[in-house]
């Protein structure tokens, strides 16, 4: 990369949202749903310019006539044709750039299957003809964004949650814990408990309304039992929400019962450790000498960590699990919704990083396997 003027592109593909923009920027230019929609029925009116597929916000707005699919499930790409459509949309419609003119930094889930990162590499070089590319692990990028190289990242998005211990910039694969419980499950759970209150939300369109209720009104209780008692004895915790049709609904203990399932997955009928235990368990899988550094640098990342009260609750829960003298610090940066992208933006604009790119030439010489040697 002799020409320093070329800005790298940074694309963070999440299960729920795709974040994209230019390296060196402090926030992504484009944030849109990772959805591809196809018409349910053949168009009646000929020449209406009906496309065979829609991506992102356009798919979302036409969701009434489309079947919506998420090509990324639980953080991992499962449908490559649709994924290609999302990347195409990202470059040409959202960022309006020619991918053959810019290096591209992509992100991947921790423990992403090897074949997947090879496929990503192949599509970038062969379909989009990028001059150079790199694949970064999401949690590691979040840690960089917080200005650290050692710590444990609790990254929780729409499709999956990971506890990832990182030492001197390297994720420790043997200690990474994955939890298939994230934003989408919480939205579904809120739909369920609102139904018990007598409000019915069933369709995919209504699910988006519930997601908005979740994002605007939910919070994490410091003491769940005590909060339940408060909610039962007074209406101080109740909030109202106006639906698109003007109807107003009231929501009470659902506000904190919904995110409580992050700490008590049994609420969702799941037999697994909550986010506090998985974080503690991941720390315990690490070498005894580095645990102190992990406890003192526990970084929250991703949209599902945006609930008010979550950092205080994590602090309380981990303090009760850890040795009594241990110093525990939970770091919750305000921009953590986008910290993976921000970390990618920082990394791709470092002068020391420029020799890390996989170039088209290296790819042509070595094939997709090069990604395992250069990105770790």
From Swiss-Prot:
It holds the Pfam family Actin. One of its GO terms (cellular component) is cytoplasm. It comes from the Eukaryota. Keywords: ATP-binding, Cytoplasm, Cytoskeleton, Hydrolase, Nucleotide-binding. One of its GO terms (molecular function) is hydrolase activity. Signal peptide: none annotated. It catalyses: ATP + H2O = ADP + phosphate + H(+). SUPFAM superfamilies: Actin-like ATPase domain. Its main location: cytoplasm. Its EC number is 3.6.4.-. Transmembrane segments: none annotated. Actins are highly conserved proteins that are involved in various types of cell motility and are ubiquitously expressed in all eukaryotic cells. Belongs to the actin family. PANTHER family: ACTIN. This is Actin. It comes from Taenia solium (Pork tapeworm). The gene is ACT1.
């Amino acid at each position: 990369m002799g020409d320093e003027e070329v800005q790298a592109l940074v694309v963070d593909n999440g299960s729920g949202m795709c974040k994209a923009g230019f390296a060196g920027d402090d926030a992504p230019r484009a944030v849109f749903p990772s959805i591809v929609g196809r018409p349910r029925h053949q168009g009646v009116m000929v020449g209406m310019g009906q496309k065979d597929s829609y991506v992102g916000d356009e798919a979302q707005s036409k969701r009434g006539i489309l079947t919506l699919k998420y090509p990324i499930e639980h953080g991992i790409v499962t449908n490559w044709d649709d994924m290609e459509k999302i990347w195409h949309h990202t470059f040409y419609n959202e960022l309006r750039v020619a991918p053959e003119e810019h290096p591209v930094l992509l992100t991947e889930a921790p423990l992403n299957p090897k074949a997947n990162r090879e496929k990503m590499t192949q599509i970038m070089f062969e379909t989009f003809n990028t001059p150079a590319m790199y694949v970064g692990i999401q949690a590691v990028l979040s840690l960089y964004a917080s200005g650290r190289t050692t710590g444990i990242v609790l990254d929780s998005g729409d499709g999956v949650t990971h506890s990832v211990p990182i030492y001197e910039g390297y994720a420790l694969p043997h200690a990474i814990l994955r939890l298939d419980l994230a934003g989408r499950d919480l939205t579904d759970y809120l739909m369920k408990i609102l139904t018990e209150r007598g409000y019915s939300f069933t369709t995919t369109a209504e699910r988006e309304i519930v997601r908005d209720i979740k994002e605007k009104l939910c919070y994490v209780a410091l003491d769940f039992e005590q909060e339940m008692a408060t909610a039962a004895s007074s209406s101080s915790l109740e909030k109202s929400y106006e639906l698109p049709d003007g109807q107003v609904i009231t929501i009470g203990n659902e506000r904190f019962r919904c995110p409580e399932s992050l700490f008590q997955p049994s609420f969702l009928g799941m037999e697994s450790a909550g986010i506090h235990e998985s974080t503690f368990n991941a720390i315990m899988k690490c070498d005894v000498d580095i645990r102190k550094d992990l406890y003192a640098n526990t970084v929250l990342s991703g949209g599902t960590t945006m609930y008010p009260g979550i950092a205080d609750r994590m602090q309380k829960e981990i303090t009760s699990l850890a040795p009594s003298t241990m110093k525990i610090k939970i770091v919750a940066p305000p921009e953590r919704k986008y910290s993976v992208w921000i970390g990618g933006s920082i990394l791709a604009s470092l002068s020391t990083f420029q020799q890390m790119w996989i170039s088209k030439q290296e790819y042509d010489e070595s094939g997709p396997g090069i990604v395992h040697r250069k990105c770790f």
